[in-house]
Amino acid sequence: MAKYLSLEEEVAVRLYTSGYYSGLNRALRGEIAITEEYKVYKELLNNALNKLPKTSSSTFYRLEKWSPESLKKEYITGKTVEKKAFTSSTYDYMAAEEMMFDDASYNVLIKIIGKNGKNIEEASLLPAEKEVLFKSNTKFLVGEIKPIPSPVNPNENIMFINLIEK
């Protein structure tokens, strides 16, 4: 990453994967107050992502946890959603499935067809996640939404959502 990013930017990417993402993304979604530190960090991380090359893949996977009611409000087929927070994903379906085995409370599998995700695994503290990160305020068109058998327990369903980056 050193050939693309300054040391400060590479450290910002690494910090994101350390768990810093949790408070940052909550603040960007409006769940907690956004501090000046988060505002500066958001700009630094977005600038770093702008400098990284696009990934060779265009299909990514993401896991989320939603109540059925909240899911129906957030994701409506044919509508555009703007993700105020950074959107983490993986280019490796098996990595997503493994995360689901580690935490069976994930009840939504999202397949993202994207063009601007940036592979950050080289700077990540968790390279096994094979993380691809989308900038804050990325917009996605909601495609198909349907129940599918859970990879963890095939007798139970999870929701599958297809998102297409705009």
Where are these regions (language model features)?
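Mono-ADP-ribosyltransferase
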Residues: 1-166
